[in-house]
Every structure is written in C-alpha cells, then in structure tokens.
Amino acid sequence: MSGRSYQVRTFGCQMNVHDSERLAGLLESAGYVPAPEGSDADVVVFNTCAVRENADNRLYGNLGHLYPAKKSNPAMQIAVGGCLAQKDRSVILDRAPWVDVVFGTHNIHRLPVLLERARHNSAAQVEIAEALEVFPSSLPARRASHHSAWVSISVGCDNTCTFCIVPSLRGGERDRRPGDVLAEVEALVAEGALEITLLGQNVNSYGRSLGDPGAFAKLLRACGRVEGLERVRFTSPHPRDFTDDVIEAMAQTPNVCPQLHMPLQSGSDVVLRRMRRSYRRERFLGIVERVRAAMPDAAITTDIIVGFPGETEADFADTLDVVRTARFAGAFTFKYSPRPGTPAAEMDGAVDPAVVSERYGRLASLQDEMSWAENRAQVGRRVEIVVAEGEGRKDSATGRLSGRARDGRLVHLLVTGPHAQEGLVRPGDVVETVVTRGAPHHLTADGPLLTHRRTRAGDAWAAGRAIAGDTPRPDRPAVSLGMPQLRPSAPAAR
C-alpha cells in the first residue's frame, strides 16, 4: 500500500475544507502520498456538499469524467464522502457504480480502512454512521497553509432553518470543551501558525451544551492570551444568538480581527419567518450598528438567498434596503434551490426562475456598488498583510504577491524598493503597506513596503521547499497529529 498516491477534491463550506485536511492527514498516516500536480492519482476522494443543487451536478459530473480513467485502470479507487454522501448513500452507487467507497460526515476516520477493504474484497464499501464517532480534531491533519489553520469548536447544528439540510446530515450541535480548543490552538501556534479561524455551524451558541452560554466570548478572550497568536477569526455566527459580550470581546481582544461574516439570508421579516431564522431585520441591523460602534473599521460580510418560496417584489426590496443600510464589504449571494427533505422544498409559492435570475442580477449589481465604495474608502490606509500563497490567481502575470489584511480583505501588493529581491518576502511573512486602489472584490497596494517581518510561518515555508532544477517548489506543512480530548465531551442538550 505504501506509496499509492491520493488527491482530495473539496466542494462546499469551510467545514468541508477542514475535514479534507483531516482526510489528507489520515491518508498520509496510512502510507499514501499526495499525487503530483497534473498527474493521475491512485485514489481520488470527493468531500461533498449537499446545500445547493449544483453540488449534486458537480459531483456526478466529476465522477463521470473519472469513469474512463477507472475503466482503463481498475486498481484506481474513488471515494465519496461528506454531506452528499451522508444524504444519498446507495444512490451514489446507482448513479456511479464505479465508485469504490462511500462514507459519511460522522466517520471520516474510517476512510483508510474502507479503501483497503474495498481493494481486498473487490467490492464497493458503503459505511454511513448516524452519529459522530470521533471528533475530527482528534485526527491527524495535513494543513494547506503554514500560517493559518482551522480549529473546530463544535460540530452539528440545533437550528431548524427550513431551507437547510445540514442538521439532518451533521447532527445536533456538539461542543468541544474550551481546554481542548485552546490546547489545539497552542499546538498550532507552536508549529508556526499566526492565524486561526474558529469553526462552528453556529459559533454563538457555543457552550450551551456545556452549561455556559457565555463560553464563546470567554474563548475569544482566552485566544487573546495565547502568545504568538496574531490573528483570530471565526465563522459562522447566527444573528439570533449574537450577544453584546461577544462584541465586547471582539473589540477588547487585540488579536481578534475586525471582521464579521454574519448571514442575513433575507432582509424581509416575512421571508425570515418562512425560513425559520428566529430573528428579524431590525435585530440584524442592530448587531451591525453595535459592531461598527465598537470597531469602526470592521469589515462586515454576509450570505443572501434570492427567490425563496413566496418571496415577493416587496420582500426583495426589503433585502436591497438592508444591503444599502448595512454597507456590506462583500456578500455571498445564492439563488434558492430546493433541497429534498427540507420543509422549504414542500412550500407553495415557488418564484419563477426568470424572476429569480433578474433579482439576483440586481442584488449582485447593488452589492458590487457597495463593495466598491467600501473598498475605495480604504485607499490611503496603512494595512498589515500576511502574505499567502495562491490567493491571487494573476500574481505570476502581474508580478504581485497577495494576502489578507486584518479585516479579511484580499490585497494584491507589489514588492518594490529594498524588499524587491526575489524570495525576500515569503508566504507567511507579515508586511505593511498602503492601499493605492480599491476594486469591488480586492484592494491593490502598489507602493513600497513600509515594513517586512519574517515569521516562523515563513521559515517553515522556506524549509519545506524542494528544489527541482532551478525552480523552487513550495511544499505543504507536515502532517499534524490529532489532539487528544482532555475530557469527554458532554452530550448535546436537546
């Protein structure tokens, strides 16, 4: 088995990205090696999403493209995991019988065993657990970045949004104890990470199953005491549970970034009620106002669904009004697509697709205007950037580097002056510069760097490079061991 190559393809949210790092770590711990870029892998793993309709189409389209390779090389293995696998189960084998392994959201640790069993038995293996067997953070991980890392604080969700299938696929919320979370954060910082993102389907409800409703604000403050941790982000909060103690912790903890991604979904109270979102527009806007009062430079982004069943032109106008009032720095906008098994899929009042597309276009145009205005306001500001690898798709053509400012904005920067020597500024290093241009989806900084600080993350990136001829090839971080739980997690309060 040693030396077989693998590739993990990830669809969906940050939870899936984090899970894919665990899948890669599990495979490498079992003797697999990453497939070189552009080559065929011996094992291809799809970590799937089930939130939107195009997720299904994307998976089955990719599986279809792999069929000729599988037919010509029967030893190749294909595995499908994640939310769509949890939902579709045997349907995947009906539609793509050349798949070797199907596993769900609750048993990702079983992947190496299932691959070996499928190979040994020459038969597809379908194993879907109905409850979480092992907390993902106890598994080894192959992190994609030297300078940043995801840290799960909870899995699952207790909300009942009528459009969302996630709770039925990932189960009810289960919280990690704060000591376990902080132990993982400290271990990641010891490895060189500068930035961590706390992950949960609803971070604001963190701690309820532990009997401490204020646990999330306390966790943010505790992260502020971790030496060497420069940036803390989190996703995703829920407006219903967003409390002032969290805003105070964000504003008073220096390494918590001035950034908030808070899903709106709709600006209409009527639609929010049908969505069962448990808050109304005034509450949402009140949170935005209080966040901006505490952190005037905070970048606030959101999610919005267009064309939910029953949405009228007046409802849509309410959404546009919230977008104007909130002045979002950016938004992920989606056309509603019914997901089988959700209450919304059975609702009357389906909106004509042509109307949905027209509204979607208007929303996108308005949000681009708002984003552009917000980003133009950044021109002339001094920003701190952690240089990243692969953030800017055109970096090689433009000669720029890219990275994220503290507020999460993407910045493309030109390295000039004494710092311009090739290789001097590395992914993971921290620089300061001045914004020279604002575009709808990014900032540009073409002036000279004001400061450049080498970091342990940059050192790790440099140490991990392998030289092929004269071309440096950056390597990824080594596999991190999973974090043992200090105490058993309490069962979720239901």
Swiss-Prot record:
Transmembrane segments: none annotated. Its main location: cytoplasm. [4Fe-4S] cluster 2 binds at C157, C161, C164. It comes from the Bacteria. It catalyses: N(6)-dimethylallyladenosine(37) in tRNA + (sulfur carrier)-SH + AH2 + 2 S-adenosyl-L-methionine = 2-methylsulfanyl-N(6)-dimethylallyladenosine(37) in tRNA + (sulfur carrier)-H + 5'-deoxyadenosine + L-methionine + A + S-adenosyl-L-homocysteine + 2 H(+). One of its GO terms (molecular function) is 4 iron, 4 sulfur cluster binding. It is an enzyme of class 2 (transferase). InterPro entries: Elp3/MiaA/NifB-like_rSAM, Methylthiotransferase, Methylthiotransferase_CS, Methylthiotransferase_N, Methylthiotransferase_N_sf, MiaB_methiolase, rSAM, rSAM_horseshoe. Monomer. Belongs to the methylthiotransferase family. MiaB subfamily. This is tRNA-2-methylthio-N(6)-dimethylallyladenosine synthase. It comes from Parafrankia sp. (strain EAN1pec). The gene is miaB.
